[in-house]
């Protein structure tokens, strides 16, 4: 019932918001003084953030309900990470943070949905940029690990928090829960909840490790027998 309510409310909010954005675009075509134009810029920016939040909420509710159709294809995790770097180049530069990357030289092919996997990786990096202490480094790492559940491909993002992390790791992935309880930065609290929900829906897992001021977020995806066979064939081992 709660998921249905969120889905319906999110959908109903889209129509008036779209109308508001349309009227703001019409206003831009008018002759406005600098003060009014500055106000319009602020309203437009806030409307864009509201639209992003509504779309995230709608997408999260849909994925939580299991009512989503994935378009599975073979993807390269390393290549996706590099693509996100390019797409977020301005945000990374504006953050003033140093991104330290360590991508495995092994094949990072996996069968997944490009849009959802992209959003997972993007949210992890955005979360690190948003909540890191100034002048610190963000570590992005891809690697393989083996265990009783078989081989897994992992993406790990580690940052130094710019605030006291006086919370339990279970709290951080709750919908609308935010690590920064003082609300000193912008955000709607959906970022890591989306990562957790999407990863689970794609057959993976999401975990967080907190050690003093170090915040480590990790997603893992199982490597299927088909993927392992394809990797062996590419390496000339079959």
Which residue stretches match the model-derived regions?
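Short conserved segment of the HATPase_c
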Residues: 164-177
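Conserved micro-motifs of the catalytic ATP-binding
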Residues: 65-70, 109-112
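A conserved beta-strand-to-alpha-helix junction within the catalytic ATP-binding
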Residues: 71-85
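Short helix-loop "hinge" at the ATP-lid/N-box region of the Bergerat-fold HATPase_c
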Residues: 128-129
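Short alpha-helical segment of the dimerization/phosphotransfer core of two-component systems
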Residues: 45-50
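Conserved catalytic submotifs in the C-terminal HATPase_c
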Residues: 71-74, 93, 98-108
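Glycine-rich ATP-binding loops of the HATPase_c
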Residues: 203-212
